[in-house]
């Protein structure tokens, strides 16, 4: 009986850790998206177009090397 109780508590703790990990990941992704959209808003459309073009050239050149 005691072993079952200990096993259940370990399982509950593992589930808690998984849930907390998911929450942390979701919060970090949310903050990252907020930062990205804030930067896009501050830079404006013309700057983003130039950055996207430069990034595209960089990716293509990296793939060709």
From Swiss-Prot:
| Disulfide bond sites | none
- Show the GO cellular component annotation of the record: plasma membrane
Q: Which UniProt keywords apply?
A: Cell inner membrane, Cell membrane, Membrane, Signal-anchor, Stress response, Transmembrane, Transmembrane helix
Origin: domain of life: Bacteria
Can the keyword Oxidoreductase be found in this entry's annotation? no
Q: Does the keyword Cell membrane apply?
A: yes
**Induction data:** By acid stress, via the EvgS/EvgA system.
Q: Where does the sequence pass through the membrane?
A: 19-39
Cellular compartment(s): Cell inner membrane
A single Pfam family it belongs to is SafA
Return the InterPro entries for the record.
SafA (IPR031411)
Residues on Cytoplasmic side: 1-18
Membrane topology is: Single-pass type II membrane protein
Q: Which residues lie on this side of the membrane: Periplasmic?
A: 40-65
Predominant location: membrane
Q: What does this protein do?
A: Connects the signal transduction between the two-component systems EvgS/EvgA and PhoQ/PhoP, by directly interacting with PhoQ and thus activating the PhoQ/PhoP system, in response to acid stress conditions.
Q: How does it assemble?
A: Interacts with PhoQ.
Q: Which family does it belong to?
A: Belongs to the SafA family.
**Official protein name in the record:** Two-component-system connector protein SafA
Organism, as annotated: Escherichia coli (strain UTI89 / UPEC)
Q: Lineage of the source organism?
A: Bacteria, Pseudomonadati, Pseudomonadota, Gammaproteobacteria, Enterobacterales
**Gene that encodes it:** safA
């Amino acid at each position: 009986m005691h072993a079952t109780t200990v096993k259940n508590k370990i399982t509950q703790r593992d589930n808690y850790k998984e849930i907390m990990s998911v929450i942390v990941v979701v919060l970090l992704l949310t903050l990252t998206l907020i930062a990205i959209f804030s930067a896009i808003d501050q830079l404006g459309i013309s700057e983003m177009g130039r950055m996207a073009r430069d990034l595209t050239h960089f990716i293509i050149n990296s793939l060709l090397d």
